[in-house]
């Protein structure tokens, strides 16, 4: 809204310096600062409001030190509000790339909110069932997949994607495009949800990954850069960078209150929303196959859970008793039970995510 207002003032009155509103880098920076300020300013009051009623139930299967924590949940609402307001102010929200990402953020945010509300207020053990979460994820995947495959703005590019490390290699999804979209959205939203187990881990890791996607979006939206780097040119895709910067700094602002010792946790409201946002952003800029690199931490966390469950079932069937690969899954709890301090685990996992981000940048030239 502010973008359109300032653009109108610039066109009618032509004040000096206001033409900067047309620069993508300016609006991305403005959106980032706005999102950060909203989270920092609104955070204390928001925490007090949630603490009055929405306290996360303690999980008995959690490591001992986690059983003592009683924190307000649904903090993801603060992230969602910050991003939505910042994007409405600074992005061209008529751009379909923008509102598709905003739809993903809100859609899975609502699913996560229902889950958190069920656990905290309605006292439903386990919250929203996995089946209904899956319905929400599949529904979002269907909407995004069908819309992008039919709308002329997207349909030319969407069914094909590039392969990291290869210059001219593309994959045509064909009739499998919509199922691929559903799988990626479901996988990423669940992966970020699994990662959200230590103070600051999901927020910090998501900020790094979304920042990386924002960089790729900026390059993909510029025909010169896209051609030089042999990545798909996404007309109008540069607006995605504005959204990514807002989401990055909303996570950083949330981290101010979520860093150990946390005052609030994002809950499924935040983790499912951020995961779907990462997935849809990657799909729109045709970098979904880069996610195992850029978002490698999320995949490791998910893989640790899958391996633990499969190995336990196999050994129980083979030997009569279930055995474990890890002391506890997801992976961060394994290191916690090995005696690593929570802060050390989080910072080391951030470092791993930064290294994966740098590796993903290298793929631009290693083709």
Curated annotation (Swiss-Prot):
Keyword Acetylation: no
EC number: 2.7.8.13
Top-level taxon of origin: Bacteria
Pfam families reported in the protein's UniProt record: Glycos_transf_4
Record's bilayer topology term: Multi-pass membrane protein
Membrane-crossing segments per the record: 30-50, 71-91, 94-114, 138-158, 169-189, 200-220, 237-257, 264-284, 289-309, 344-364
Pathway participation: Cell wall biogenesis; peptidoglycan biosynthesis
One annotated GO biological process: cell wall organization
GO molecular function list: metal ion binding; phospho-N-acetylmuramoyl-pentapeptide-transferase activity; UDP-N-acetylmuramoyl-L-alanyl-D-glutamyl-meso-2,6-diaminopimelyl-D-alanyl-D-alanine:undecaprenyl-phosphate transferase activity
Record keywords: Cell cycle, Cell division, Cell inner membrane, Cell membrane, Cell shape, Cell wall biogenesis/degradation, Magnesium, Membrane, Metal-binding, Peptidoglycan synthesis, Transferase, Transmembrane, Transmembrane helix
Stored NCBIfam families: mraY (TIGR00445)
Similarity comment text for this entry: Belongs to the glycosyltransferase 4 family. MraY subfamily.
Protein name: Phospho-N-acetylmuramoyl-pentapeptide-transferase
Lineage: Bacteria, Pseudomonadati, Chlorobiota, Chlorobiia, Chlorobiales
